């Protein structure tokens, strides 16, 4: 379920959780710096913390809880968001049987943004039991459905279960096997393709605001620096900077499943990956399996030190969750999905890279 911003935004001194001893309202009153009317387009500044009541509230049955994540567009714009509930002890979680209001914490990290009431930055999934699929279950699913394709459209020869952190850079070349290790391994693509040699985008600093209500309006060159495939197939990430990269794999999520991207292991590097972790049923699949996978776009930031990434380096894992029922409408153009069959795609506010290039006057 997409969650919509309400009519008021509060700028606060710091991020917080209310805990059991306080309400969100009392915490906001204690920490509030300013208040903004979202009935009109409103600028949110970078690295400031905002808390916004959402239009949705919940009255859940005792056996149903929830988990939230940023939407894809939110992650690609480096907007840090987290769901908060009254009495909540952790972000992004809704306890079973929760009845009450919902709030979202917003921190634009790279670009100032313009939002208004009704803007959708995050989404909520409801959970009843239904633990993530074990590797054994995932292997059985991979025998029935192709879950991973590669650039040539071919699926892997087989799904293989591996354990541990060996082969951090795939020795098989990344085009023979789908490696299952607490989910499907996800690796970086620093090679590019026949249609594009761009393997990453690095966000510029001190850019104009991005109005989230706009679609295909902004010139990518004003906000992003393209990184082309180096001969070494290696890229050094500058600490603190924000990058968009693509997975080597093209993933397919069958209609009866959803998926979630998680970091592979925090011990393999000081970086964060993929704010927007949900993959809807039908992602890279289509109505009847006719789509041969879709790349995952990875939002990556190195933290304290420069970080060297190599082609085919393991960077995350895709966890599959079985749905209670297959949805009536799958991910795709029929429901306005922006990123089906994507390559390395910027958020929908930006013009397609080739279109932006063709609009530049010739000298």
Describe the function of each predicted region.
Residues 1-363:
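DUTPase catalytic domain/fold
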């Amino acid at each position: 379920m997409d969650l919509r911003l309400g009519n008021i935004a509060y700028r606060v001194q710091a991020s917080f959780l209310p805990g059991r001893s306080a309400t969100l309202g009392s915490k906001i009153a204690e920490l509030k710096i300013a208040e903004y009317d979202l009935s009109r387009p409103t600028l949110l500044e970078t690295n400031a913390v905002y808390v916004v009541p959402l239009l949705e509230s919940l009255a859940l049955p005792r056996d149903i809880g929830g988990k939230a994540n940023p939407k894809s567009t939110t992650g690609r714009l480096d907007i840090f968001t987290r769901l908060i509930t009254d009495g909540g002890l952790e972000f992004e979680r809704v306890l079973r049987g929760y009845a009450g209001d919902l709030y979202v914490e917003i921190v634009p990290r790279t670009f100032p943004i313009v939002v208004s009431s009704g803007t959708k930055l995050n989404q909520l999934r409801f959970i009843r039991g239904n633990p993530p699929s074990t590797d054994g279950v995932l292997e059985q699913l991979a025998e029935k459905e192709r879950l991973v394709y590669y650039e040539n459209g071919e699926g892997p020869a087989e799904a293989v279960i591996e354990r541990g952190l060996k082969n951090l850079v795939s020795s098989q070349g990344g085009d023979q096997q789908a490696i299952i290790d607490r989910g499907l391994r996800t690796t970086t693509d620093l090679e590019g393709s026949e249609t594009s040699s761009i393997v990453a985008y690095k966000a510029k600093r001190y850019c104009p605001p991005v109005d989230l209500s706009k679609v295909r309006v902004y010139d990518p060159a004003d906000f992003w620096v393209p990184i082309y495939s180096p001969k070494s197939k290696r890229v050094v990430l500058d600490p603190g900077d924000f990058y968009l990269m693509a997975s080597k794999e093209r993933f397919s999520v069958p209609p009866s499943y959803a998926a979630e991207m998680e970091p592979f292991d925090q011990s393999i590097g000081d970086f964060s990956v993929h704010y927007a972790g949900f993959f809807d049923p039908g992602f890279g699949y289509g109505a009847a399996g006719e789509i041969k996978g879709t790349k995952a776009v990875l939002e990556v930031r190195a933290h304290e030190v420069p970080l060297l990434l190599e082609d085919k380096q393991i960077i995350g894992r895709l966890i599959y969750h079985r749905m209670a029922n297959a949805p009536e409408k799958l991910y795709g153009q029929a429901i306005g999905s922006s990123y089906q069959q994507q390559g390395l795609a910027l958020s929908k506010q930006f013009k397609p890279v080739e279109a932006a290039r063709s609009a530049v006057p010739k000298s």
